[in-house]
Amino acid sequence: MDIIKALAKELDKQEEHVSNVVTLLDEGNTVPFIARYRKEMHGTMDDQTIRTLADRLQYLRNLEERKKEVLSSIEAQGKLTEELRARIESAETLAAVEDEYRPFKQKRRTRATIAREKGLEPLALLLFAQEKDCPAPEEAAKEYIDEEKGVSSVEEALAGAGDIIAENISDDAAVRGALRDYAMKCGDVCSEAAKKDPEDTVYRNYYKFTCAVKSIPSHRVLALNRGEKEGVLKVWVEVPHDNALELIFRRVVKKPACASTAFVKAAAEDAFDRLIEPSLEREVRAALTETASEGAIGQFALNLRPLLMQPPVKGFVTMGLDPGYRMGCKVAVVDGTGKVLDTAVVYPTHGERQKAEAIRTLSALIKKHQVKHIAIGNGTASRETEQMTVELIASLGKGAGVSYAIVNEAGASVYSASKLAAAEFPEYDVNLRSAVSIARRLQDPLAELVKIDPKSIGVGQYQHDMPEKRLSEALDGVVEDCVNAVGVDVNTASAPLLARVSGLNAGVAANVVKYREENGRFTSRKQILKVPKLGAKAFEQCAGFLRVPESKEVLDNTAVHPESYAAAQKLLSLCGYTEEDVRRGNLGHLMERLHGYGEERAAQACGVGLPTLFDVCAELKRPGRDPRDELPAPVLRTDVMEIKDLKPGMELKGTVRNVIDFGAFVDIGVHQDGLVHISEISDRF
């Protein structure tokens, strides 16, 4: 198989571009680096396309490796024909390769194996051949009666021959492939309650359920799997029996009028019922689960991306509230950079007196530290805490300018109990660390959420049922893409954030922080090369994603890669600008002047391709830009609504909390997320 051609066809990309990406990946370049700084080589593929290409590349390489192993094994057995070699080499899936290899695998001792040991294979081959002069099975079997070999009757001889024919049919790659395709197109997934009198559970819709394999939604597959795992449901796949047999007969019945044809048909039915159908059911369910899992993982990644890319509310003193009942509401005040200024614990749910005391305490903290925003975790007691916050803001008066936002606190408790949090806040109680995290999530969601395992953020469907390695890889890829799309200030970033930068890992990130602590702030990108264990290759991969606002070189605070500095300076010169104009934001007519000069001509003069030229232009026009600023800002409120306040026809601004197969859940500020059904979003579903 030509892997490059296969990938180009599958992804609908030029072979040259696919080949270039494969080479870049093999050379150790990261996906963000390739996507951003090698656009001319791959035709401006985005990071998600490159990740898909990398995944499929790995699969196809594994497929080719398995083909070699299978061919070698069959050849060693002296059974490799040119026809078989061609079929294996042209196989497009691992399942197809395994189907071809099935007859040649070392098997445990089966009924057919025992029959072969008794010398019944010639009888089986004779009957299966269905020649014109083939005797009746009972007559043919008489010659194979041999007491010494354990064949004492015609019935025993025919039973053994039937077992051999059944196994041969079961091992036939064409038969299995055809039945698998038929099951996927015409089979049904069925379920029923595992117990006679089932309780009313979340699985009640599946107590008597049937859906076509070809159209069953992914969320139903995962729900059935979970119900079966919990012992609530019995799940199986039904394939139309007679049609499946007819499909086999078309392949094994050679001469319908032959004396042995009925015997072969009976063996074929045994092959389907005893050997093929059980494994076929496993294969169909495995395929459905794999597809559903990939879909759910993709949806999880889709939900995670906007959560990470929420616009930051930077530069304001922020109060974080981690609501709770028995343990109270934990409070943390952080400055505009996220540094902790104050902490407290209040008990607004312990009666009116305690609630009034909580408002007084929080009011004092707000006045003391000039708090502008309050971030409220959306967990237990969030509703009561929000109501108290509204009363608190009202008590401060309209001139206070304080507003609040509900923040998704998923994973905050996981982070607060982690070694990372303990190292960052050794003097604070676990619960207070959660309040700090909630405050910072409003200030800079990305910088805070990278400290948490993405699986703990909880924005997916059935995420705990997913293959853990595959889920982690997909979500880590999303985090990496988001971090590098935004860029990282090398002088303020935490080690966990730096570890997500292209080309860096946890060890090198820790070295960056240590170097910064020992030598002071970085004053240029070049200085990053002085960090221990950060070599030339790592610098090439990370430099464009690290920002140094304090640098005298204005390009050090942009996404322009150092390798393109000369091109950027040449472009400025061609358009009549200087670096000072970049600092002052005086490049309003840059694109106009570039167009006047000629884009192609300018790219040639600068020694770069058009994609890089346009990227450089974008960075020069808005140095230090944050792509998150172009997205909808967090919803900041000063008052609270109740469900009873809603009326038909009202238009509300909300935050999408979760996207699932059947729609999207939206927080509109009434303590209960509203469902926008897929029928309201899409024309087809």
Briefly describe each language-model feature range.
Residues 1-19, 26:
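Generic start-of-chain signal for non-secretory N-termini
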Residues 30-31, 42, 46-148, 485-630, ...:
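Accessory alpha-helical DNA-binding modules that contact the DNA backbone or grooves
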Residues 34, 119, 322, 374, ...:
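Residue-level signature of catalytic and energy-coupling elements of molecular machines
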Residues 49-52, 59, 63-320, 324-428, ...:
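Duplex nucleic acid-engaging cores and interfaces of nucleic-acid transaction enzymes
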Residues 242, 271-279, 402-489, 494, ...:
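OB-fold/S1-family RNA-binding modules
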Residues 332-334, 665-670, 675-679:
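Short, acidic/hydrophobic/Gly-rich beta-strand patch recurrent on exposed beta strands
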Residues 659-664:
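Short, conserved beta-turn/loop elements at beta-strand boundaries and strand-helix junctions
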Residues 679-685:
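Short, intrinsically disordered, charge-balanced linker/junction segments flanking boundaries
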